[in-house]
A protein has these predicted regions:
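General marker for long, soluble alpha-helical cores
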Residues: 1-112
């Protein structure tokens, strides 16, 4: 059994779903710190966005919290990809729709 298979078995035994295990496997294969997103409260979509941001070396760690929905994490990642100051909207108390609105406004201001 390979090291990757052993790690996946560990997460399978802890109740992670097939899609979550796929994200874990992709993270292991890309050599990122999977510990940032292998928390039980993250669904596969949140894990996907966190994994992709880690692979791009974006500073997602402060926002890798299960208090955010996957759509909120998505908006934070989109902002980080554009080099925006996501602290303006990175709050679990702000809906993802409002986050999107703020992010788009920040993008517009950066393009002026």
């Amino acid at each position: 059994m390979s090291k990757t298979d052993k790690e996946l078995k560990y997460y399978l035994e802890r109740g992670f779903s097939g899609k979550q295990l796929e994200e874990i496997k992709k993270g292991i294969e890309s050599g990122i710190d999977i510990g940032i997103y292998t928390k039980k409260g993250f669904g596969a979509k949140a894990m996907y966005y966190i994994r992709k941001s880690l692979e791009k070396e974006l500073d997602i760690k402060p926002y890798a919290s299960t208090s955010y929905s996957w759509k909120q994490i998505q908006q934070i990642v989109f902002g980080l990809e554009k080099n925006l100051d996501v602290t303006f909207y990175a709050s679990h108390k702000i809906s993802w729709e409002k986050m999107r609105e703020i992010r788009l406004q920040l993008e517009k201001e950066c393009n002026v």
